[in-house]
Swiss-Prot record:
BP GO terms, sorted: intracellular protein transmembrane transport; protein import; protein targeting; protein transport by the Sec complex
Name of the featured protein: Protein translocase subunit SecA 2
Documented EC number(s): 7.4.2.8
Residue numbers binding ATP: Q77, G95, E96, G97, K98, T99, D493
């Protein structure tokens, strides 16, 4: 906190400079205020920096905010805006106006002409903020666009996207930006590209995007895989295993693997001798997928089974928010393994065409900043991973919410009934209540109990999230009772209804401590916004998931069989200090494990990041290279010919002829009887002649240098893309296959890096051969419009 105090003092000095321009800006006409934008651009061109301009530019935006929106940013909002410009994280409490705060750094950084972007977690917020705040930017002469559309079925064309991303300021969502990046890197030509270089970004709810979503990569799926029958076989096998005897489950690392006895059981079940030999890699992959499906993925925590239009389906849940992740599937066959576990129809397993994690996506920006209500507790991770400080911004009004001590019980039913008594007490007074649960299942249990007590309420979980923003916004009305899963309503302000403040404000009841402290803070933060009164309280039992998973072994002895009737009448609160310390220790252990898991994800993703950047850079170089495509092709052709002539041997003329028919030309003449198949020079000369004949024939047929260049470029890009798809898919399968090899005394990460490197080198060789094959062995045709139609081998 001492460090934060000094940071605040430093920010106040810059704030004073901003305020020194206040009266001057207030005296300007609208036209004069608007002219400041051009003046700032000219001063930048003359050598001033954005830091030099900040005090005056922020004063301009404050005045524009007041004139256009009727809102003048508070001093604390200006301090948050300074933090954002500096590329750090501003921790600002709920209701402190993060949306308005962002107008200042977005305007300032957009003055450079290199673009500024605000990324939020959902389409509704991106469109709302772009529409409302966009009035300010347009008033000041800047362009602003939203890169998302309300109708998710509507697809923007590359031309429309190019216009959007060329705007000075862009509002979008993390997923939309990620998919736009991946899709652009599958483009065949310049006309299909649309992104501007990534310059400056503000990430709203930065901890949710960069930490909580860090382990779910964005994936574009392509061609389907051949469906395997191993899923049901392995699912059956897993049900025969006993924990600790046949497999070990590590709570802390959230990993599971076979013991030596389990390996023998697998070899016996599958009638194999060596389970982990190279030829059994696909079996091992499916075995690991099934094991993970049964032990790592929990129904109603990580996914729900929902009745679809025709059949039941597995739909993923966002653990942090409790929301359904529609249209999202686990990759590498994990989704199908869960479907096999739940005995629903298996969906088609597809290959991953392109993939990136949010960590690596946002590292592409020159400068990252972010806003959140709960960043300070994970400051060390932001500093280690992104070199960003977290600065806690004071609230504009003092927080007067009462955070009451936790109530701790031995059993789950005791806790539930005690919390229900608390709900009835406050409901009788007329206080609005917001009850947060840790799972869909618990939210529905509380809903049933409230119905039994005759208490009308709204239930908000993954099964009925359509009216989320509306339900949360109305939950501050007198007598309102809302039951919700952990983080519902993030980004939505709860305003108190008439008379509620006199009753003590909104009461937030947490029915369990969550697996990280940030979610608990966010739950508390639903109440007591902008100086409003409020109350928050958590009810905990020793049987909660947090303590079951992360508590000490001696705690398990206290679990007992119980009669619901008995505990309902006499819930006994645990008051001993040792129990209270347990919760904090369990939460720290959980957070430490999650941090380690994110670090491992980043280390695995780093390997793909390097390979992806090399591949995408090569693609873009070819798309941009108008004249140099011939040189590139000559270089690749020479390498492939050299390899075929000098590094391969042919026993007979028939062998050489078969090679030519498979890789160079369908039209080649038979090899002369006197041809020396043992002379690499002769073979190289022959292959060079055949290649030149094929290329000249295609060029003559097209009768256009432009069409021929287009054909060459598409041939090369197709080879790159097909082989990169194979490599992405291979890396995903490799990670799964190696994840279960803990018994082997080898570091899975080191093994992964070595195998991935070898795979990448092999991919590059395959790619060169495919380029030559595409160029020489494709069939061409011209349609009536004069466009070339290509049929690749």
């Amino acid at each position: 906190m001492i460090k934060n105090h000094f940071q605040i003092q430093r920010l106040k000095k810059i704030l004073a400079k901003v305020k020194s321009f206040e009266s001057e800006m207030a005296g300007l006409t609208d036209a004069e205020l608007r002219k400041k934008t051009q003046e700032f651009k000219e001063r930048l061109a003359a050598g001033e920096t954005l830091d030099d301009l900040l005090p005056e530019a922020y004063a301009v935006v404050r005045e524009a905010d007041k004139r256009v929106l009727g809102m003048f940013p508070y001093d604390v909002q200006v301090m948050g805006a300074i933090v954002l410009h500096e590329g750090n994280v501003a921790e600002m409490a709920t209701g402190e106006g993060k949306t308005l705060t962002a107008t200042m750094p977005l305007y300032l950084n957009a003055l450079s002409g290199q673009g500024a972007m605000l990324v939020t977690t959902n389409t509704y917020l991106a469109l709302r903020d772009a529409q409302e705040m966009g009035q300010v930017y347009r008033f000041l002469g800047l362009t602003i666009e939203a890169a998302v559309v309300a109708d998710e079925t509507e697809n923007l064309t590359p031309k429309q996207k190019r216009l959007i991303y060329q705007a000075d300021i862009v509002y979008t969502t993390n997923s939309a930006l990620g998919f736009d990046y991946l899709i652009e890197n599958l483009a065949e030509n310049k006309d299909s590209q649309y992104l501007s270089p990534f310059n400056y970004v503000i990430i709203d709810e930065i901890d949710s995007i960069l930490l909580d979503s860090a382990q779910v990569p964005l994936v574009i799926s392509g061609a389907p895989r051949v469906q395997s029958n191993f899923y049901s076989i392995m699912d059956t096998f897993i049900t025969t295993l006993k924990e600790e005897e046949d497999y070990h489950y590590d709570d802390e690392k959230n990993e599971v693997w076979l013991t030596s006895k389990g390996i023998l059981a697998a070899e016996s079940f599958l009638d194999l001798e060596h389970l982990f030999s190279k030829e059994n890699q696909e079996l091992v992959r499916h075995l690991n997928l099934a094991l993970r499906a049964h032990k790592l993925y929990k129904k109603d925590k990580d996914y729900v089974v929902r009745q679809g239009d025709k059949e039941a389906e597995v739909v993923l849940l966002d653990r942090a928010t409790g929301r359904l992740l529609e249209m999202t599937r686990l990759q590498g066959g994990q989704h199908q393994a869960i479907e096999a576990k739940e005995h629903v129809k298996l969906t088609e397993e597809t290959r991953a065409m392109a993939s990136i994690t949010y960590q690596n996506l946002f590292r592409l920006f020159r400068k990252i900043s972010g806003m959140t209500g709960t960043g300070k507790v994970v400051e060390s991770e932001f500093m280690e991973t992104y070199s960003m400080s977290v600065i806690k911004i004071p609230t504009n009004q003092p927080v007067i919410r009462q955070d009451l001590p936790d109530q701790l019980y031995q059993t789950l039913p005791e806790k539930v009934f005690a919390s229900l008594d608390e709900v009835k007490h406050y409901h009788a007074q007329g206080n609005p209540l917001l009850i947060f649960t840790g799972s869909v299942e618990m939210s529905e249990i509380y809903s049933s109990l409230l119905l039994r007590e005759g208490i009308a309420h709204n239930l908000l979980n993954a099964n009925n999230a359509a009216r989320e923003a509306q339900i949360i916004a109305e939950s501050g009305q007198k007598g309102a009772v809302t039951v919700a899963t952990s983080m519902a309503g993030r980004g939505t302000d709860i305003k108190l209804g008439p008379g509620v403040a006199d009753l003590g404000g909104l009461v937030v009841i947490g029915t369990e401590r969550m697996e990280n402290q940030r979610i608990d803070l966010q739950i508390r933060g639903r109440s007591g916004r902008q100086g409003d009164p409020g109350i928050s309280k958590f009810f905990i039992s020793l049987e909660d998931d947090l303590l079951r998973k992360w508590g000490p072994d001696w705690l398990k002895k206290l679990y007992k069989d119980y009669s619901t009737e008995e505990v309902q009448q006499h819930p006994v609160q645990l008051g001993q200090r040792r129990f209270r310390r347990l919760v904090a220790k369990a939460q720290r252990a959980s957070e430490s494990s999650a941090k380690m898991s994110r670090r491992m994800t980043l280390e695995y993703a780093q390997c793909m990041k390097i390979q992806r950047e090399i591949t995408y850079a090569e693609r873009n170089r070819l798309i941009q290279a108008e004249e140099r495509i011939d040189e590139e092709i000559s270089r690749v052709l020479s390498q492939v010919i050299h390899q075929a002539a000098y590094e391969q041997s042919y026993e007979t003329r028939a062998d050489l002829y078969r090679f030519i028919l498979d890789h160079f030309s369908y039209h080649a003449e038979r090899i002369p009887y006197d041809f020396d198949i043992y002379s690499p020079e002769k073979i190289a000369e022959l292959l060079q002649d055949i290649a030149e004949q094929e290329l000249q024939a295609k060029k003559a047929y097209l009768k256009s240098d432009k069409l021929f260049t287009h054909f060459q470029r598409v041939s090369v890009l197709k080879a790159i893309d097909e082989n990169w798809v194979e490599q992405v898919d291979y890396l995903q399968q490799l990670k799964t296959a190696l994840s279960g090899q803990h018994f082997s005394m080898k570091n899975p990460l080191v093994e992964y890096y070595q195998e991935a490197y070898d795979g990448f080198e092999y991919m590059k060789e395959r790619m060169k051969q495919q380029i030559v094959k595409n160029l020489l062995m494709s069939e061409l045709a011209l349609n009536p419009k004069g466009e070339v139609i290509m049929y690749f081998p």
